């Protein structure tokens, strides 16, 4: 389709046939013992990229080179100083491959709203989308090296990546199929609609799968249930929603092995029961097809995702030559990044639902949280006895028997930027797709960027840099939350930082042809609603199909080349100067209190002393890397049966629909 016209032209989505042969060793949701090398060590220090990622990048760089050069030439072809643009592109794509810009894309959380609106934004960058080259940014996705997702954004990135790198175009064109991806016409609690037998059977299967894992001796929580339920919507052609499908299986998919797609990265936060996480102290975990871990000084380690569930000490299996495989179920890891249960508990007082329902929901969800059931349990802890934690930091993460992970946006960083701004990944530009519901009307207000910027001044942000951004009042008052905005346009203003961070292209969800500001907890969408939100996302990412600014695609090209152009002291086309005037935040501040936005806490007035205060607050090393020894070693498990699960999800859904 042209997403703005919704024209069906593409063949139906093929079944997954990308050469995957791994799957769970039990062909079920239950992990199992497998043999592994006697000298294997599953842990490494976070001092650089893994060798697996380095080797994969060599192949990806070959593919992105041609795609990016083609994209840049196309979007700058209408520059009056075309020769200047061509010369710059030729210089960047000379024999020295280190001069070629590297791109990352980050899709925010926000439930199905973020998944669908983010899908529209990503489709605008995909040359497989009809009309994306003419009316959008087609080819940009093919030129990207990384694609990060969090919560609802993670549902998007996982759907595309683990369905043989399918396209949003294909998904939309296949909506009439019996086994259509993203068929969310019925709530996750009642997938059969009026067909109660289908609903009952679905929940029996979910209950059986999770109960079997529990009987095998593995801890389970509602994250297992949540992930299993979601999987049916994202992998409908696979047996029971991919009950045996693994995160590490992507390594064996031809489209990934050949680096024909960006590397997907998902994000979650570390949290122990009884603690809270904020932007300054959270331990941000990332998981790629190769590894799970964190760059943060509270852990500074990565482990092989394929052998999660193995009992280890400093990365060495407790039993020589024996590991666990099958723990990394794709639904479980996908559900880990989107544990909406505790997200609702944290934000319920900010909702407008009736007080008596709020009190009931708070009581119900508080009981869940106190029982630790809202947390994804990774046990045994893959980082047990890890020796890479900063000496000035609590070692709770490595001393605990269990690793607890929650929704990646719980620390306020709802756009998963942390993995993409690491110096080791050396990106020049990151596209931040923000579909958060920050304001009272469920639009973004830049809070996520504010939190990521602020984090660099705390202990956990050591060694990470991020360009200056304003607070939420300024975002709203200047309208920065209603159109694409560039941050960090001039590297000369950041020479005092440890390294020059990527330029950030902020693309917020905003109203164009459809009200895409649905509630995070809206659990069902009609086909009309799905297509409306996707279409609006396409328009938000393209300045309304380039009708609001016919030069917008060229400006994106300028932004992509900016870091390398400055580093190499090359001549910039004059059109790029105009672009930067129009789209770069120029430092203007407007602290007038804006209605219904995330509190900035006088963020716009922050100075060096404020940053020092932030660092001081973080020095205690509390929150995600601390708790009482009783809580951090508490066994966590849910008594699983179909009736209990159905009752829990039904009650949650009834409340969510009132938000």
Curated annotation (Swiss-Prot):
Q: Write down the PROSITE patterns for this protein, in alphabetical order.
A: PLA2C (PS51210)
Q: List the disulfide bonds.
A: none
Query: Is Metal-binding a UniProt keyword of this protein?
Result: no
Hey, what's the signal peptide range on this chain? 1-22
User: Its GO biological process terms?
Assistant: glycerophospholipid catabolic process; phosphatidylcholine acyl-chain remodeling
Q: What is its main location?
A: secreted
Residue ranges of domain PLA2c in the record: 35-590
Location in or out of the cell: Secreted
Q: Which residues are glycosylated?
A: 33, 45, 78, 82, 96, 127, 164, 177, 219, 281, 349, 392, 493, 517, 545, 569, 605
The regions listed as transmembrane in this protein's record are: none
What are the alphabetically sorted keywords of the record?
Glycoprotein, Hydrolase, Lipid degradation, Lipid metabolism, Secreted, Signal
Q: What's its job?
A: Catalyzes the release of fatty acids from lysophospholipids. Phospholipase B may well contribute to pathogenicity by abetting the fungus in damaging and traversing host cell membranes, processes which likely increase the rapidity of disseminated infection.
Sequence similarity: Belongs to the lysophospholipase family.
Q: What is this protein called?
A: Lysophospholipase 1
Q: Which organism is it from?
A: Candida glabrata (strain ATCC 2001 / BCRC 20586 / JCM 3761 / NBRC 0622 / NRRL Y-65 / CBS 138) (Yeast)
Lineage, please? Eukaryota, Fungi, Dikarya, Ascomycota, Saccharomycotina
Gene that encodes it: PLB1
């Amino acid at each position: 389709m042209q997403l703005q016209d919704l024209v069906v032209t593409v063949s139906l989505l093929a079944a997954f046939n990308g050469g995957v042969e791994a799957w769970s060793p039990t062909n079920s949701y239950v992990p199992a013992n497998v043999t592994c090398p006697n000298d294997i060590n599953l842990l490494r220090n976070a001092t650089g990229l893994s060798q697996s990622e380095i080797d994969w990048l060599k192949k990806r760089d070959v593919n992105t080179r041609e795609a990016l050069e083609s994209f840049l030439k196309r979007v700058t072809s209408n520059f009056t100083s075309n020769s200047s643009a061509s010369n710059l592109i030729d210089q960047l794509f000379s024999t020295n491959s280190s001069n070629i810009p590297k791109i990352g894309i980050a899709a925010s959380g926000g439930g199905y709203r973020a998944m669908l609106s983010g899908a529209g934004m990503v489709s605008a960058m995909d040359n497989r989308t009809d009309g994306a080259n003419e009316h959008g940014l087609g080819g940009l996705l093919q030129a990207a090296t990384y694609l990060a997702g969090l919560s609802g954004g993670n549902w998007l990135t996982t759907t595309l990546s683990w369905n043989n790198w399918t396209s949003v175009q294909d998904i939309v064109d296949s909506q009439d199929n019996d086994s259509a991806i993203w068929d969310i016409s019925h709530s996750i609690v009642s997938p059969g609609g009026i067909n109660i037998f289908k609903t009952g059977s679905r929940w029996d299967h979910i209950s059986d799968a999770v109960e079997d894992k529990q009987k095998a001796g593995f801890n389970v929580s509602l994250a297992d249930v949540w992930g299993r339920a979601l999987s049916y919507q994202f992998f409908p052609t696979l047996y029971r929603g991919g009950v045996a499908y693994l995160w590490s299986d992507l390594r064996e998919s031809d489209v990934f092995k050949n680096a024909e797609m960006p590397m997907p990265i998902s994000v979650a936060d570390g949290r122990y029961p009884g603690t809270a996480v904020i932007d300054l102290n959270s331990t941000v975990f990332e998981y790629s097809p190769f590894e799970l871990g964190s760059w943060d000084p509270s852990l500074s380690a990565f482990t092989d995702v394929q052998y999660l569930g193995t009992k280890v000490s400093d990365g060495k299996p407790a039993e020589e030559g024996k590991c666990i495989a099958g723990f990394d179920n794709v639904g479980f890891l996908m559900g880990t990044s989107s544990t909406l249960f505790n997200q609702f508990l944290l934000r319920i007082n900010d909702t407008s639902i009736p007080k008596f329902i709020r009190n009931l929901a708070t009581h119900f969800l508080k009981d869940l949280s106190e029982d630790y059931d809202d947390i994804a349990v990774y046990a045994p802890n893959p980082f047990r006895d890890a020796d890479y934690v900063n000496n000035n930091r609590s070692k709770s993460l490595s001393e605990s028997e269990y690793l607890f992970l929650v929704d990646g946006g719980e620390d306020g960083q709802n756009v998963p930027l942390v993995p993409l701004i690491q110096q080791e990944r050396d990106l020049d530009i990151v596209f931040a797709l923000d579909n958060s519901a920050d304001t009272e009307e469920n639009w973004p207000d830049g809070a996520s960027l504010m939190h990521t910027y602020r984090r660099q001044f705390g202990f956990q942000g050591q060694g990470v840099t991020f360009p200056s951004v304003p607070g939420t009042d300024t975002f709203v008052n200047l309208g920065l939350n209603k159109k694409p905005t560039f941050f960090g346009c001039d590297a000369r203003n950041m020479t005092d930082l440890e390294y020059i961070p990527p330029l950030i292209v902020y693309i917020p969800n905003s109203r164009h042809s459809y009200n895409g500001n649905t509630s995070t907890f809206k659990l069902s969408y009609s086909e009309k609603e799905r297509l409306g939100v996707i279409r609006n996302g396409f328009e938000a990412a393209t300045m309304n199909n380039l009708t609001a600014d016919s030069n917008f695609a060229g400006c994106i090209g300028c932004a992509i080349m900016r870091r390398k152009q400055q580093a190499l002291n090359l001549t910039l086309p004059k059109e790029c100067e105009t672009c930067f005037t129009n789209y770069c935040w120029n430092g203007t501040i407007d602290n007038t209190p804006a209605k219904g936005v995330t509190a900035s806490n006088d963020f716009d007035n922050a100075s060096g002393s404020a940053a020092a205060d932030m660092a001081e607050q973080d020095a205690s090393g509390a929150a995600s890397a601390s708790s009482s020894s009783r809580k951090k070693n508490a066994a966590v498990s849910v008594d699983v049966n179909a009736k209990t699960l159905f009752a829990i999800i039904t009650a949650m859904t009834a409340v969510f629909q009132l938000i």
